[in-house]
Amino acid sequence: MRVNGIVVCRGDASVGPDDRVELDSPAPAAFPAPLRLIHEDEHLLVVDKPPGLLTIATETERERTVYRLLGDWMRARGGRRIFVVHRLDRETSGLLVFAKSVAVKRALQAQFEARMPERVYVARVEGVVTEPEGMLTGYLVEDRTLRIRAARDTRRGKEAITRYRVLERYRGATLLELALVTGRRGQIRAQLAALGHPIVGDRTYGSRRDPLRRVCLHAARLGFVHPSGRRVVFESPPPSSFRRA
């Protein structure tokens, strides 16, 4: 507070009828780094997640997650709660949508369960993919180490379908665009490893190179039906380093 241009910190300071009183508004809460805000409205938030950050808490990491960072930011603004709609692996960067109400969360999750959203990724993989485009199909299971892998016995696995097309070919590597038809956990990473083209930097799935010290997988496009009824599409270009790795 300022009285006649002078900062006053005491709450019991006397003020006369001719004094000029100014109240300083608190600075708005800064959006939490290293996230990037893509879109916000009364119904939802869309953010760009960096690699190395969990979407939600696990038993070993509860503090530094996208959900926690966004929740703290919303509370600092006097806002409402947020609700998780879907997730990205810690190693994957790119687009995530969060709901601002239970009703919106349920509506969006129903779209994901019905395979309605457009979910497109970009990945740099090891080796040269010869076919310009194609479909990755199969079944996935979780092994004893909790890693997702291709199932030999289709009766035990969950169906996984991914469309792909080649964006660029390099010496010993390929840049792919991958569109999810199903949305299984670890789907793209497991399917590309089974194909013999693990994602660059993905040591878990057999990559022998890690030039960027990250898994070269990025959620680049996310489209769905907004609660208003209109279809919306959000985009986040993949890191330029994917073309140089």
Regions found by a protein language model. Give the residues of each.
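Pseudouridine synthases involved in rRNA/tRNA modification
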Residues: 155-161, 168-171, 175, 181-245
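Conserved beta-strand elements flanking the ATP-binding pocket of the protein kinase catalytic core
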Residues: 86, 165, 179
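RNA pseudouridine synthases
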Residues: 1-149, 158, 216, 237-244
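Short histidine-centered beta-strand/loop micro-motifs
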Residues: 56-58, 109, 151-153, 168, ...
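Conserved hydrophobic positions within beta-strands
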Residues: 37, 125, 163-166, 199
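A short alpha-helix capping/helix-coil boundary motif
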Residues: 47, 167-168
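Short glycine- and Lys/Arg-enriched binding-loop motifs that mark or flank ligand-binding interfaces
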Residues: 1, 48, 90, 95, ...
